[in-house]
Amino acid sequence: MKKTKIMSLALCFALILSGCASMNNTTKGGLIGGGGGAAAGAIIGGLIGKGKGAAIGAGIGAVVGTGAGVLIGKKMDKAAAQAAAIEGAQVEQVTDNNGLQAVKVTFDSGILFGTGAATLSSSAKASLSKFANNVLKQNADMDVDIYGYTDNQGWKNSTAEQSRQKNINLSQERAQSVSTYLMSCGVTSAQIKGVQGLGEESPVADNSTAAGRQENRRVEVYLYASPEMIQQAEAGTLQ
């Protein structure tokens, strides 16, 4: 019975979101903030966080009102536009664990790093510097999570399990390199809530092709409303 209820709720919320394709975050923020509620937000947030051990954004345990959702949506619209101007960044609109709009920024690891390496290239530093200064520091009231991923290719003279662990370690080092560099550009450690390498987990493309493997070698940065931002939005004071 519990499983049936969860599936029904997820389906209902999916139908709500299917009507949002042409809306910006401001409109969707109001719809999700007012109608989705905490339960639906937990489901959608759980889907975003699948394989990460936790959903994006800490659940606040309460329904976020429509007006607050609209204000947060406006902020996310602005952050998404700022991020879209960064070379090498792919921007998507996603939903956090509170059912609120968030921003996902994906960087191709082939652009950031050399093969099998976790040292940032010069061009990567230039892009990340702009990302830090033009996006993260301009939205200091947003929390940030950073996740690193690899393809499923094995390592020379290693078993499948050894390769899997090496890929996890490499993705962790890459995510940490991005985090460390962003902080060197003035982003505070308090803003970056999580840094994790997930190796081969959650591929976004087919690992049987070279193009697919390149897509899977990536670093994802999530920007989502902090508890303080949600409080300000609820109070109507969020700028």
Task: Specify the residue positions occupied by each region the protein language model found.
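Solvent-exposed coil/turn segments that connect beta secondary-structure elements
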Residues: G88, V94-D96, D108-G110, G116-A118, ...
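Short, low-complexity, glycine-enriched hydrophobic/amphipathic alpha-helices that associate
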Residues: A21-A84
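C-terminal motif of bacterial Sec signal peptides marking the signal peptidase cleavage site
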Residues: L15-G19
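Bacterial N-terminal signal peptides that target proteins for export
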Residues: M1-A10
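Extracytoplasmic
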Residues: I86, N98-A102, T106-D108, K130, ...
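Periplasmic peptidoglycan-binding/anchoring modules of Gram-negative envelope and division proteins
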Residues: L112-G154, S179, V221, A233
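Amphipathic, membrane-active segments
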Residues: K75-K104
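Periplasmic OmpA-like peptidoglycan-binding domain that tethers envelope proteins to the cell wall
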Residues: T150-Q231, Q239
